[in-house]
Amino acid sequence: MPLVELLTSAALGLSLQLLHDAIIRAKERSLITRCILDRLDATLHKITPFVIKIDTLTEEVDEPFRKVIEELKRLLEKAIRLVDAYAELKLRNLLRKYRYKRRIKELDSSLRWMIDVDVQVNQWLDIKKLMGKMSEMNTKLDDITRQPMDIIEATGRSSEEDGCTKPTIDIHFRWKNQTKEHEIRFIFK
């Protein structure tokens, strides 16, 4: 596994844990806006299986998927900063609290959107499995077509015996699959 991908997956897990800790600290300080932080925490619990899948898939990710991982990492870091700054605000600074609350809601909705719509990890896994099966089937097909075949070309009865003026060509293909023998015979008159 390349070092960059290892650091990215480790950074995602670490960012997730740091954000969860920041939410717990913010909940302890601010009882009034606990519902917003609970919603963000629920989103984190929804993201956790996704991050675990990313950790297992980082060995062979494509460029678009790597961009999605970087975007998720950036969103998690932004969420950590927002939640920490929100927890530090005093109760009497209502305008700033409102702004931070609105930004946290937007961040939560973008995280949910990223997981629900933009990133389809299960579909990506299914496509990856199908591509593997297709590759395996192509390999088997190549093995079948590359097997040596017995080709027999023979001229049938002579035209004098038949009373015909056209010669007969007999082409016979034989090949053996794992347990079966196959033959195809073509006769041209």
Swiss-Prot record:
* InterPro entries the record matches: Powdery_mildew-R_dom
- Role noted for this protein: Probable disease resistance (R) protein.
Give the transmembrane region(s). Answer: 7-24
Residue limits of the RPW8 domain?
A: 1-153
Name a biological process GO annotation: response to fungus
What kind of membrane protein is this, topologically? Single-pass membrane protein
Task: Give Gene Ontology CC terms.
Answer: membrane
What Pfam families does the annotation carry? Answer: RPW8
Domain of life where this protein originates: Eukaryota
Q: What is this protein called?
A: RPW8-like protein 1
Keyword terms, alphabetized: Coiled coil, Glycoprotein, Hypersensitive response, Membrane, Plant defense, Transmembrane, Transmembrane helix
Subcellular location field:
Membrane
What is known about its induction?
Answer: Expressed in leaves after powdery mildew infection (e.g. Erysiphe cichoracearum UCSC1).
Keyword Transmembrane set for record: yes
Q: Which family does it belong to?
A: Belongs to the plant RPW8 protein family.
Q: Does the keyword Lyase apply?
A: no
Q: Mostly located where?
A: membrane
State the PROSITE patterns in the record. Answer: RPW8 (PS51153)
Glycosylated sites = 177
Coiled-coil positions: 65-92, 126-147
